[in-house]
Amino acid sequence: MNRKKLSFIFLLLLSLNISAQLIVSEEPIVLKTKTGDIFGSLKAPNSKTPVPIAIIIAGSGPTDRNGNSQLTQNDAYKMLSDELFYSGIATLCFDKRGIAASQSAMKEESDIRFENYIEDVKEWIDLLSNDKRFSNIIIIGHSEGSLIGMIAAENNPKVTKYISIAGMGLPFDVILKEQLEKQLAGQPQVTKDLIFSYLDKLKQGETISNVPPTLNALFRPSVQPYMISIMKYNPQEEIAKLTIPTLIIQGTTDIQVPIEHANLLSVANPKAQKVIIENMNHVLKDCKSSDMAEQTPTYSNKSIPLNKEIGKVIINFIKN
């Protein structure tokens, strides 16, 4: 066989090997719970030695394992997990109970509690810790998932590192009051007082009866137990309990979670590393403006790539 043929065969084999490495290997995974199955996607690089695995926890609302919902289609979590995969880090993304494929794990809205999400993550940790393909477990929580993740990681020897992305730095009721204060501008004071009194009552663990129809969307009886359960937690107090390496990431053009929240979390856990990413918004995409008209396309266009810095920051933190 002449030298040209050998060179051609070598280049062909090399290209096939590179192509194989670029294909994301994804397998379905199921967590069995007492109330139903929770479905996820596991991406594990082909490796002869164990690799780290990151559990990515979605934010609030009907956001699925890829970062999408009926109103938003941005593939943020899918893009992040793919980037970690290419760097040799395995990932688990899952539909939280009651969401997408895991819909049946929540029979009724009134059944769900914030603690259910925490316990689910703990069970995922237990499941993955028995998989010999993985060397250590990292928790990545986005938005509301940040609080879920930090509580699940507390005093858990199976978790080696924790990452908060756009995490809340204030209790849920405080955030809700701040948002409503802006939305209720111009409304009668009596309306504002009534709404805030309802929030105070929920904070005390009390349910509200005879909610006016105009306020039913926010205070419907079926959602009150969940609101009571999440109001128990203060993110600053929870992140202060973490003794493992911790990374706090925040974008400068996030219109849902201001930078102040990252600062509050950082003060609460001084040993944590804080990274502020310029022009990154809440869905981890580039956006130079906080104007809604410019933000909207990043929430609903899958072709817009992930911010270039966030993957590098996370990979460096996990590997070092």
Sequence positions of predicted segments:
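Conserved alpha/beta-hydrolase
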Residues: A76-Q103
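Accessory cap/linker subdomain of secreted extracellular hydrolases
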Residues: I163-E237
